[in-house]
């Protein structure tokens, strides 16, 4: 059948038919307005209760058929743990009240649906349908095995889960537990490639002589459906703030869209001024605790200076 933004979870994933999320629509879920919990530390369930190190019940240091998910260098998770992650999400409690709360869950759920629907993995799908023909040749999941680590910025010195320098593997623990391929995390890139992808969005699905999707698709995703409820989000995309605080300098068109990332990334496209702004940092290195990048508004201050320079 046809999937629209009003399609409910139970209509695309039969396992959700008896879930408290059965009536959640794609629109509300991707606008982060569906009472879904922000995240779940799945990795914590796999640590030894005494040593707090990865438990032998779940991990091995050598790959085998049963332990096939590489979460970092020489550490392999049980292959069947993917099902456990999906079950934890499906059975999770809803938040007590309906309000805007960013959640990673929609991207776990929809990754499962997309891979099932296309009978292919997400990393293959985006490579074949987008990155390759966009000429985004440095954009990929799991670069560790594909390009030299000298070209990859290290992510974090992890002292709570993987207990090593995470380098060439995704920072997000939940994505690492999905073999590095998350719907919400895991893509490595450089500023030039991200700019190509954002330019394709800016041109409503058209880039380099090729149409990737219809202009009206971008328009539907770049719409704030719950602005009247105080939720600024588009579908997947973040949008400029409605009040004081938010993801942009506050000096930018409401038609603009983009996203920021936990590890220090930021990409924003403004159709009015035809500007794409990309900022990439590894702010989680050496550790993720101190978020000076956010506290000092560095990404949005640079954005403000760009706009001041144009307007002047």
Positions of the model-derived regions?
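Short, glycine/proline-biased beta-turn/loop segments that scaffold the active-site neighborhood
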Residues: 4-19, 132-133
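Short, surface-exposed loop or secondary-structure junction motifs
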Residues: 21-254
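Structured C-terminal helix/loop/strand segments within mature extracytoplasmic catalytic/sensor domains
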Residues: 259-312
């Amino acid at each position: 059948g046809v999937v629209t933004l009003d399609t409910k979870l139970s209509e695309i994933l039969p396992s959700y038919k008896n879930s408290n999320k059965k009536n959640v629509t794609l629109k509300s879920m991707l606008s982060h307005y569906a009472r879904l919990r922000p995240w779940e530390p799945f990795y914590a369930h796999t640590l030894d209760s005494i040593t707090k190190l990865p438990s032998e019940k779940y991990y091995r240091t050598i790959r085998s058929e049963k332990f096939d998910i590489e979460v970092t260098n020489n550490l392999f998770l049980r292959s069947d743990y993917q099902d456990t992650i999906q079950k934890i999400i499906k059975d999770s409690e809803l938040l007590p009240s309906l309000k805007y709360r960013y959640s990673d869950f929609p991207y776990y759920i929809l990754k499962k649906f997309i891979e099932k629907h296309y009978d292919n993995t997400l990393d293959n799908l985006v490579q074949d349908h987008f990155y390759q023909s966009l000429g985004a040749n440095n954009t990929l999941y799991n670069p560790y095995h594909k390009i030299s680590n000298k070209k990859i910025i290290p992510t974090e010195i992890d002292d709570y889960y993987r207990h090593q320098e995470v380098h060439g593997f995704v920072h997000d623990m939940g994505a690492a537990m999905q073999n590095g391929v998350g719907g919400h995390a895991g893509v490595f890139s450089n500023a030039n490639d991200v700019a190509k992808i954002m330019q394709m969005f800016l041109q409503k699905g058209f880039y380099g002589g090729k149409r990737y999707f219809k202009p009206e698709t971008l328009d539907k995703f770049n719409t704030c459906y719950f602005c009247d409820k105080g939720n600024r989000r588009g579908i997947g995309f973040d949008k400029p703030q409605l009040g004081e605080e938010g993801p942009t300098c506050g000096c930018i068109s409401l038609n603009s869209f983009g996203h920021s990332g936990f590890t220090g990334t930021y990409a924003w496209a403004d159709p009015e001024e035809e500007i794409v702004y990309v900022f990439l940092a590894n702010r989680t290195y050496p550790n993720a605790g101190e978020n000076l990048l956010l506290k000092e508004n560095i990404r949005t201050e640079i954005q403000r200076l760009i706009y001041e320079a144009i307007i002047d």
